[in-house]
């Protein structure tokens, strides 16, 4: 086993979602709304680690990691489709214990040091033009489409990381390893930033681009529409997306749920011992 020795290792693998939380709701079928659960921690993972064994059995390890997360559906209904993914950099400090020369376990603390949760929103709504223009004919509809992205940034989180692995020597100072890793961490939401906004409206077959400010005006009109069974869902929709239309929006104190980043992953890697 490594004894009073330093080492570095690189690894790559895939993390599967764990400790799923509700990311949003699927109301595609208005009579049966379901929760959309998941974890932004699902996706491809890479790590660079450095460690030192100060005893035949015990060592300490510092690791830097990157997550390229898979798309997760976050909200869905008849006019809205939202999905999100994580792009995150993390750091961890762990104790490593050699059970045998080949088998080891590690456990420690982990935090995120950079990255974002990216949410993509597509809106496609057919609305009575009269909602926005009282003089419009009762039958005229406006077809409104919008596409935009938001980058969500969080506060510094702290979580637990642990793993069990098996290493086998392939040369004097080189070993391959395979390991299972458990990560439990949630990122408190801090702020979101709008990017890549585009929108159009189509009235009587004529399509024109509309600005962010015009689109915000449409949403404000929906929010202020008289309450009725016909407008309830639209009012809720406008209220839901209005924070996402701000260039920068602070979520602090708004009761926003933490973003889940937990995973159970499998990694393959190589270690070089000095």
Predicted regions and their residues:
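Outer-membrane beta-barrel translocator domains and adjoining extracellular loop/strand segments
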Residues: 20-29, 72-79, 117-126, 189-197
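Surface-exposed loop/turn segments flanking beta-strands in extracellular/periplasmic regions
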Residues: 30-32, 128-137, 199-209
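Extracellular loop and loop/strand-boundary signature of outer-membrane beta-barrel proteins
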Residues: 28-37, 76-84, 145-152, 252-256
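Predominantly the C-terminal beta-signal and adjacent terminal strand-loop region
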Residues: 169-274
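Short glycine/proline- and aromatic-enriched beta-strand/turn motifs that initiate or cap beta-hairpins
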Residues: 3-63, 67, 127-128, 256-273
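Gram-negative (and chloroplast) outer-membrane scaffold detector with strong preference
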Residues: 7, 49-145, 153-160, 168-173, ...
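Feature marks short, surface-exposed loop/turn motifs that line or immediately flank catalytic pockets
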Residues: 14-20, 68-70, 113-115, 184-186
């Amino acid at each position: 086993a490594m004894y009073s020795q330093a080492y570095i290792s690189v690894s790559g693998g895939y993390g599967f979602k764990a400790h799923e939380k509700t990311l949003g709701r699927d109301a595609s079928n208005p009579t049966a709304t379901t929760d959309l659960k998941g974890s932004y921690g699902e996706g491809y993972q890479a790590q660079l680690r450095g460690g030192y064994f100060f005893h035949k059995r015990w060592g300490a390890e510092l690791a830097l990691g990157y997550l390229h997360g898979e798309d997760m559906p976050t909200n869905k209904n008849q006019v809205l489709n939202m999905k999100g993914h994580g792009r995150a950099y993390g750091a961890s400090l762990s104790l490593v214990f050699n059970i045998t020369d080949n088998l080891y376990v590690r456990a420690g603390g982990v935090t995120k040091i950079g990255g974002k949760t990216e949410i993509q929103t597509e809106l496609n709504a057919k609305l009575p033009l009269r909602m926005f223009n009282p003089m419009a004919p009762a039958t005229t509809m406006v077809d409104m489409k919008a596409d935009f992205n938001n980058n969500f940034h969080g506060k510094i989180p702290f979580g637990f990381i642990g793993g069990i692995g098996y290493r086998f020597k392939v040369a004097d100072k080189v070993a391959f390893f395979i390991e299972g890793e458990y990560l439990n961490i949630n990122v408190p939401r801090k702020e979101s930033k709008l990017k890549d906004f585009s929108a159009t409206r189509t009235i009587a077959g004529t399509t024109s681009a509309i600005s962010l400010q015009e689109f915000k005006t449409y949403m404000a009109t929906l929010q202020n529409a008289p309450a009725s069974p016909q407008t309830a869902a639209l009012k809720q929709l406008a209220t839901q997306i209005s924070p996402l239309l701000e260039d920068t929006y602070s979520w602090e104190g708004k009761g926003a749920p933490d973003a889940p980043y937990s995973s159970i992953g499998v990694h393959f890697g190589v270690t070089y011992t000095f």
